[in-house]
């Protein structure tokens, strides 16, 4: 398997070493080895059910770890609670768009805020649409606005590693394009290490210079996005298009 190295040991923001994980006794991930350099952006693609969301859940501490280690900036975080992983520097925008529906958009950001470069103003600069809706409650926002808010909430906690799970899911194409432009701008300029899980392979390969393909709970490709973008047949083989 082709494999890209995510920086030197001193530069690695996040590392999964021989990780085996799942839910209870059910193992979903096998022998996951992934290193993410500081300021590096990686997309994770693959069919539904291959373990992409479980990968992020394992990094956040939501799964049962059956083997291996998860390290953040060289520190083993495998045995610590999720809330402590957040204080150590993980930011997470989950697939479920976890926001407080009865709070205003502004209040949703305020409760997640921690000191650092990301503030209400910088989130609004990234997502101007949110500034226009700042005083609307969470349950009054569209799906696209809720997704932008979920990412904004993760950012305003001022992480060093940002995890995003399926940000384009269920959104209209015009909103997907708007969101993609913002996410690409974010990953290029923020200095954050970022893992983007995305079902839309074309979108993922455009945003992230490095791609990871998963199949049946394992990483089957880790290398340049450009290689896959230029060879759709190879991407289809890796993902398992047409396989029953």
Descriptions of predicted regions:
Residues 64, 76-97, 120, 132-136, ...:
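ABC ATPase NBD coupling module
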Residues 60:
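Helix-to-loop junction immediately C-terminal to a conserved catalytic motif
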Residues 162-166:
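Catalytic Walker B motif of ABC-type/P-loop ATPase nucleotide-binding domains
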Residues 68-76, 88, 118, 122-125, ...:
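Conserved ABC transporter NBD signature motif
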Residues 154-155:
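ABC ATPase C-loop
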Residues 45-47:
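The feature captures the beta-strand-to-loop junction immediately N-terminal to the Walker
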Residues 177-191:
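Helical segment within the ABC ATPase nucleotide-binding domain
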């Amino acid at each position: 398997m082709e494999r890209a190295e995510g920086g030197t040991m001193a530069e690695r923001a996040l590392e999964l070493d021989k990780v085996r994980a799942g839910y209870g006794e059910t193992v979903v991930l096998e022998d996951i080895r992934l290193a993410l350099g500081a300021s590096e952006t990686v997309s994770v693609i693959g069919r539904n059910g291959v373990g992409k969301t479980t990968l992020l859940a394992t990094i956040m501490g939501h799964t049962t770890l059956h083997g291996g280690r998860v390290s953040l900036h060289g520190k083993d975080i495998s045995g610590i609670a999720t809330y402590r992983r957040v204080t150590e520097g993980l930011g997470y925008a989950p697939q479920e768009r976890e926001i407080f529906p009865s709070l205003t958009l502004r209040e949703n950001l305020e409760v997640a805020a921690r000191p650092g470069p990301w503030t209400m103003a910088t989130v609004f600069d990234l997502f101007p649409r949110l500034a226009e809706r700042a005083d609307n409650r969470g349950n009054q926002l569209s799906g696209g606005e809720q997704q932008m808010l979920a990412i904004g909430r993760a950012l305003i906690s001022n992480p060093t590693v940002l995890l995003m799970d399926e940000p384009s899911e269920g959104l209209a194409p015009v909103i997907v394009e708007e969101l993609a432009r913002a996410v690409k701008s974010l990953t290029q300029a923020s200095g954050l290490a970022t893992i983007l899980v995305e079902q839309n392979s074309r979108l993922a390969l455009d945003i992230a210079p490095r791609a990871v393909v998963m199949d049946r709970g394992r990483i089957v490709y880790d290398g340049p996005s450009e290689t896959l973008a230029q060879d759709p047949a190879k991407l289809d083989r890796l993902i398992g298009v047409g396989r029953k």
